[in-house]
From Swiss-Prot:
It comes from Desulfitobacterium hafniense (strain DSM 10664 / DCB-2). This is DNA ligase. Its EC number is 6.5.1.2. NAD(+) binds at residues 32-36, 81-82, 110, 133, 168, 284, 308. One of its GO terms (biological process) is DNA repair. Zn(2+) binds at residues 402, 405, 420, 425.
Length: 659
C-alpha cells in the first residue's frame, strides 16, 4: 500500500471516528477547525489521486448533481403509521389492549421528532440506498442527499451482510433560522417550519444544497440485525449507537402506564427546550418478542402509539366568514382571521365545518377567538372570548342560494352539511378536477389549482376528462405555463392514463369513497365496466363497504353524466382495469430472501423480479422462507438458512427458474 493510500485511509478513519464521537456519542473529540482541516486534506488527496476514491469516503458528503427525478424504491417492509393518543384515556386504552394479549409489559418512551421518516439500507457494511417514506410501501430514493448528513454513517462500524435502518431526518432550529434568514435576504419565500424545510432539503436535485442545510438524523429501528436477535427496543438503540448512528438520548423506560402518563405531562412543559422540534412522544413495548406477538393492524403496529402534545392555542379575530363549495357540493364556512403565528406557521384561515358547529360555539363575525392546529396541522377555532365582545359582532347565516351558481341550497335530514343542488356548479366541477389530478388519484404533476382555474376560464376544459384532449398550442400562451411547462404537463397527463383502476376510482370523487375504498373496489371488480354494474346489495357484502358507501357508489354509476364522463376517459385511452402483472406468478405465495454480493444483477433488481413473479422479497430468514438466493460473502442469513434446512440457490440457479 502506497504512502498516499495509507494517508487517505487514515484520514477516513479519523473523520469517521470523529463523526461517531460527535453524532453517535455526543462527545466531540475534534474542534471544527481540526475537523475541517482533515476533511479538506482528504478531498485534496482524492482529487489528486482519483484511483483511491470510494463511494463510502467521508468526502462524498459534500454532494453533487443528481438526475432530474428521484427513482421509486419499494421498502423491505411497509412503513406503517402509528395510532395517535391525545390524552390519558387514550393511553390507558392502549395499555389495556396490550395487556389483554401479553402479561408483564415494559414501555420505552422516545421523543417524536418533527421531521420525515427515512429508510436506509446497508449491504456488506456500506450504505447503498436511502429513501423517503412515500406512501409507506414505495418511496423516493434520495441516497445522494442522505450521504451529505454527517449523522448517517456511510459505512457501519461493525460488518453486517444487510441492515435496514429507519429513523427521522430533521432540521435543527438553529439551521432553520439561519436558512430562513438567508432566504429573506435573497428575496426568496420562507419555509413555514423546520419539517417543511427538511423535506424540501432532502428533495434537492443538487445534493450540494442539501449538504449546506445542516440536517440531522436520529435512527430508531432495525429490521435486519446481523448479530443475533435483539431482545428489546433499548437493545436496538444500543446496537444502532454501536454501528455509528446518531440515536436520540432522551428516551425513558417505564413498567407502568401511569408512569408513562406522568412523563407525558412533564414533557408537554419541556417540549420547547430541545434544539429541534418535537410534536409528541412515541410509546413502544420494549420486548421485541412481545412486539411480534402483538403484531400489526392493516395500518399500524399494535405495540406502539404516538402521544400527540396538546395543540398550542393563540388569540385572533374573525374578520369574516366565507363559504367554500367543495366537489360534492358541500358548503363549508371558513373563518378569515387576523393572521397570527401558531405551531410553526402563520394562519389566516380556519375551517368552521358547518352551521351546527358555528351555532354550538356561537362564533360571530368580529369575535375574538382562540385557534389551534388540530394535530398541529389543521387550523380550527376552539372557542370564542365572550368577555371581549363589543356588541358590534354579526351573526352568520347560511345562504339559501349557492354563492357560486345561485342554485338552491339544501340540508338533507340527518346531515349537518348544506349542499348545492346543481351537479354543474362551477365550484363543484373545479374542485372535482383538483381532486382528480391529486397525487393519490391520477397524480398529474404540474396541474395545480391556479393552472386549473386558467384552463376553466379559457374554456379549454369543462371537466377532468377534457384534460386528455388538451393540445400544446393551447397551453403555451397561458400565464403560468410556457413551452417547457406545457411539454411536461402533457407528458404527465399522458402518463396518468396508466395509473390503473384504484386511483381512478378514488379520483372520481364518489361520496364516501376514499383511497382505501378505491383499492377495495378495484380488487373486487377488476374493471370499471364490472363496477358500473354493481348493485347496492352486493356492494354491501364487501368488507369495509357500509350501506352509505354502497348506496353512494350505486347512485353515482346510475347517473347519465357519469356514463358520459367515463366514455370520454375510455376514448382518451385511460386504463380502466386493475394493473395485473403479465408475468407468470411462479413465486406466488413464496417468501424469498436475497443475500450476499451478486454478479449478474444487483440485489434490488432481483427482489423486484421476485415480486413481479408473485413472490415476497423478505429481509430475514425464517421457517416460512421458501428459498434463499445467495451471492458471494453471504453472511448470517446463509448460515441461518442452512441451520433451518432452507434451500439455497446460486444466482445462476435462480436465473434458471425464470421463464
Amino acid at each position: 500500500m502506497s504512502d498516499v493510500s495509507q494517508r487517505i485511509e487514515a484520514l477516513r478513519e479519523q473523520i469517521e471516528e470523529a463523526n461517531y464521537q460527535y453524532y453517535g456519542l455526543d462527545q466531540p473529540t475534534l474542534s471544527d477547525a481540526e475537523y475541517d482541516a482533515l476533511l479538506q486534506e482528504l478531498i485534496r488527496l482524492e482529487k489528486e489521486h482519483p484511483e483511491f476514491l470510494t463511494p463510502d469516503s467521508p468526502s462524498q458528503r459534500v454532494g453533487g448533481y443528481i438526475a432530474k427525478e428521484f427513482p421509486k424504491v419499494r421498502h423491505a417492509e411497509a412503513l406503517l403509521s402509528l395510532d395517535n393518543a391525545f390524552d390519558a384515556g387514550d393511553l390507558l386504552e392502549f395499555d389495556r389492549r396490550v395487556r389483554s394479549m401479553v402479561a408483564e409489559v415494559e414501555y420505552v418512551v422516545e421523543l417524536k421528532i418533527d421531521g420525515l421518516t427515512v429508510a436506509l439500507t446497508y449491504e456488506d457494511g456500506a450504505l447503498v440506498r436511502g429513501a423517503t417514506r412515500g406512501d409507506g410501501e414505495v418511496g423516493e430514493e434520495i441516497t445522494a442527499n442522505l450521504k451529505t448528513i454527517p449523522a448517517i454513517p456511510l459505512r457501519l462500524r461493525k460488518q453486517a451482510d444487510r441492515l435496514d435502518v429507519r429513523g427521522e431526518g430533521y432540521m435543527p432550529k438553529g439551521s432553520f433560522l439561519r436558512l430562513n434568514q438567508e432566504r429573506e435576504e435573497a428575496g426568496q419565500p420562507l419555509f413555514a417550519n423546520p419539517r417543511n424545510a427538511a423535506a424540501g432539503s432532502l428533495r434537492q436535485l443538487d445534493s450540494r444544497i442539501t449538504a449546506q442545510r445542516k440536517l440531522g438524523y436520529f435512527a430508531y429501528q432495525v429490521l435486519t440485525p446481523e448479530e443475533g436477535e435483539l431482545a428489546s427496543q433499548t437493545a436496538v438503540l444500543d446496537y444502532l449507537k454501536e454501528q455509528g448512528f446518531s440515536v436520540n438520548p432522551e428516551y425513558r423506560v417505564f413498567s407502568a402506564i401511569e408512569e408513562v402518563i406522568a412523563y407525558c405531562g412533564e414533557m408537554v412543559e419541556k417540549r420547547h427546550n430541545y434544539p429541534y422540534d418535537i410534536d409528541g412522544l412515541v410509546i413502544k413495548v420494549n420486548d421485541i418478542a412481545q412486539q411480534r406477538e402483538l403484531g400489526f393492524t392493516a395500518k399500524s403496529p399494535r405495540w406502539a402509539i404516538a402521544y400527540k402534545f396538546p395543540a398550542e392555542q393563540v388569540e385572533t379575530v374573525v374578520e369574516d366568514i366565507v363559504i367554500r363549495v367543495g366537489r360534492t357540493g358541500v358548503l363549508t364556512p371558513t373563518a378569515y382571521l387576523t393572521p397570527v403565528f401558531v405551531a410553526g406557521s402563520t394562519v389566516g384561515r380556519a375551517t368552521l365545518h358547518n352551521l351546527d358547529n358555528i351555532r354550538a360555539k356561537d362564533v360571530r363575525i368580529g369575535d375574538h377567538v382562540l385557534i389551534q392546529k388540530a394535530g398541529d396541522v389543521i387550523p380550527e377555532v376552539v372557542k370564542i372570548l365572550p368577555e371581549k365582545r363589543t356588541g358590534g359582532e354579526r351573526i352568520f347565516e347560511m345562504p339559501e342560494l349557492c354563492p357560486e351558481c345561485q342554485s338552491p341550497v339544501i340540508r338533507e335530514e340527518g346531515e349537518a352539511a348544506h349542499r348545492c343542488t346543481s351537479i354543474t356548479c362551477p365550484a363543484r366541477q373545479r374542485e372535482a378536477i383538483i381532486h382528480f389530478v391529486s397525487r393519490n388519484a391520477m397524480n398529474i404533476d404540474g396541474l395545480g389549482p391556479a393552472v386549473i382555474y386558467q384552463l376553466l376560464e379559457a374554456g379549454l376544459i369543462k371537466d377532468a376528462a377534457d384534460l386528455y384532449a388538451l393540445e400544446y398550442d393551447a397551453l403555451v400562451p397561458l400565464e403560468r405555463l410556457g413551452k417547457k411547462s406545457a411539454e411536461n404537463l402533457l407528458k404527465a397527463i399522458e402518463d396518468s392514463k396508466e395509473r390503473g383502476l384504484a386511483p381512478l376510482i378514488f379520483g372520481l370523487g364518489i361520496r364516501h369513497v376514499g383511497e382505501k375504498a378505491g383499492k377495495i373496489l378495484a380488487q373486487k371488480y377488476g374493471t370499471m365496466e364490472d363496477l358500473e354494474k354493481a348493485q347496492v346489495e352486493e356492494l354491501q357484502e364487501i368488507p369495509d363497504v357500509g350501506p352509505a358507501m354502497a348506496q353512494s357508489v350505486a347512485q353515482f354509476f346510475q347517473q347519465e353524466s357519469t356514463h358520459h364522463f367515463l366514455n370520454k376517459l375510455r376514448q382518451a385511452g385511460v386504463v380502466m382495469s386493475a394493473q395485473h402483472s403479465a408475468k407468470p406468478q411462479i413465486f406466488a405465495g413464496k417468501s424469498i430472501v436475497v443475500t450476499g454480493s451478486l454478479q449478474r444483477w444487483d440485489r434490488h433488481y432481483v427482489e423486484t423480479m421476485i415480486e413481479e413473479f408473485g413472490g415476497k422479497a423478505a429481509s430475514s430468514v425464517s421457517k416460512k422462507t421458501a428459498f434463499v438466493v445467495a451471492g458471494e460473502k453471504a453472511g448470517s442469513k446463509l448460515a441461518k438458512a442452512k441451520e433451518l434446512g432452507i434451500p439455497v440457490l446460486s444466482e445462476e440457479e435462480f436465473a434458471e427458474l425464470l421463464p
